[in-house]
Amino acid sequence: MNTYKNSLNHFLNLVDCLEKIPNVGKKSAFKMAYHLGLENPYLALKITHALRNALENLKTCASCNALSETEVSEICSDESRQNSQLCMVLHPRDVFILEDLKDFLGRYYVLNSIEDVDFNALEKRLIGENIKEIIFAFPPTLANDSLMLYIEDKLQHLHLTFTKIAQGVPTGVNFENIDSVSLSRAFNSRIKA
């Protein structure tokens, strides 16, 4: 029985909590707990304050389901954005990733889960904002292909254009490291050089 570890319940609880963060293992969690608890307690207090503020203020946009600190997100209330395109993504974090690219200036819709989609409200939004194209920005999987077909079927009466982001060979990756479906799609979706 290790009585030393038993005497550090609060510290070990912090390690356990940090370890529950995705992609953080036991060693990294221990290093973070040690740093925050002993080497930089001021940073720990700042993180605590920032975490509390985020939890108290974060919500999802009533229009697009993206993260927001207001009822309607800045993206949805920005009149300079293009109204003709709506980019559908699976998760709120996908909006962050696409916004960082600065390639898309339209609107978003975060699915979260297909069971939660209010197709009547979505249809009203598509008509009200004069959306002409839905861009599916989903990772390439058979399940997501089925999801796209399902959504297209539910909204086909609106006569929208449905597109999806291109798939292909990632930059700097050798063919032997690419699955055959991705390589085949890239080959069949080739463009003029």
UniProtKB/Swiss-Prot annotation:
For biological process, the GO terms are: DNA recombination; DNA repair
Pfam families from the UniProt entry? RecR_HhH
Q: Report domain Toprim positions.
A: 84-170
Top-rank lineage group of the source organism: Bacteria
Gene Ontology terms, MF aspect:
DNA binding; zinc ion binding
> Which UniProt keywords are given for this protein, alphabetically ordered?
DNA damage, DNA recombination, DNA repair, Metal-binding, Zinc, Zinc-finger
Zinc finger regions (C4-type), where? Answer: 61-76
Keyword check for DNA damage, yes or no: yes
SUPFAM superfamilies reported for this sequence = Recombination protein RecR
Q: What family does the database annotate?
A: Belongs to the RecR family.
Q: Which HAMAP family match?
A: RecR
> Per its database record, what is this protein's job?
May play a role in DNA repair. It seems to be involved in an RecBC-independent recombinational process of DNA repair. It may act with RecF and RecO.
Identify this protein by name. Recombination protein RecR
State the organism named in the record: Helicobacter pylori (strain J99 / ATCC 700824) (Campylobacter pylori J99)
**Organism taxonomic ancestry:** Bacteria, Pseudomonadati, Campylobacterota, Epsilonproteobacteria, Campylobacterales
